[in-house]
Structures are given as C-alpha cells and as structure tokens.
Amino acid sequence: MSIVFQIALAALVLFSFVMVVGVPVAYASPQNWDRSKPLLYLGSGIWAILVIVVALLNFLVV
C-alpha cells in the first residue's frame, strides 16, 4: 500500500507542476480560449481527484 501512496503522491506533485505552468499560459493566450477551457476544467478535475486519492491513501497508510 505504501508503494501505491508514493506513486499517487508523485503523480500529484508532477501534475501540480504541469498545472502551475499550463494554467497561466492558457489564460494568457486569448485566441485559443475555446480550446483551452475544456482542458483547464479537465486538468482541474484530475488534480482534485488526485488530492482526494492521496488523502485517502494517506489515511490508510498511516
């Protein structure tokens, strides 16, 4: 179970770095807003799910 927690935590950290770079770039480019908006919503949803998964795994591991 500890390995699954570590993989989920690493995925959350890496995805957070991607979002830190990607979200400002998406907001700064108005010409692609129609195409960027669904990707932002999808990315935000994936990030929120990863946070919940890491929290649940942390509860089970500790």
Curated annotation (Swiss-Prot):
Q: Which UniProt keywords apply?
A: Membrane, Photosynthesis, Photosystem II, Reaction center, Thylakoid, Transmembrane, Transmembrane helix
Cellular component terms, GO, for this chain's entry?
A: photosystem II reaction center; plasma membrane-derived thylakoid membrane; plasma membrane-derived thylakoid photosystem II
Q: How does it sit in the membrane?
A: Multi-pass membrane protein
Q: Which residues cross the membrane?
A: 5-27, 38-59
Query: Pfam families attached here?
Result: Ycf9 (PF01737)
Query: Which SUPFAM superfamilies does the UniProt record give?
Result: PsbZ-like
What is the annotated localization of this protein? Answer: Cellular thylakoid membrane
Which one GO biological process term can you cite for this protein? Answer: photosynthesis
Which InterPro entries has this protein been placed in? Answer: PSII_PsbZ, PSII_PsbZ_sf
Q: What is reported when this gene is inactivated?
A: Grows slightly slower than wild-type under photoautotrophic conditions (40 umol photons/m(2)/s), grows less well under low light (7 umol photons/m(2)/s). Does not grow under photomixotrophic conditions (low light on glucose). PSII is normal, oxygen evolving capacity increases, the PSII:PSI ratio decreases slightly.
Q: Which family does it belong to?
A: Belongs to the PsbZ family.
Against NCBIfam families, the record matches this protein to: PS_II_psbZ
Function recorded in the entry: May control the interaction of photosystem II (PSII) cores with the light-harvesting antenna, regulates electron flow through the 2 photosystem reaction centers. PSII is a light-driven water plastoquinone oxidoreductase, using light energy to abstract electrons from H(2)O, generating a proton gradient subsequently used for ATP formation.
Q: How does it assemble?
A: PSII is composed of 1 copy each of membrane proteins PsbA, PsbB, PsbC, PsbD, PsbE, PsbF, PsbH, PsbI, PsbJ, PsbK, PsbL, PsbM, PsbT, PsbX, PsbY, PsbZ, Psb30/Ycf12, peripheral proteins PsbO, CyanoQ (PsbQ), PsbU, PsbV and a large number of cofactors. It forms dimeric complexes.
The name this protein carries in UniProt is: Photosystem II reaction center protein Z
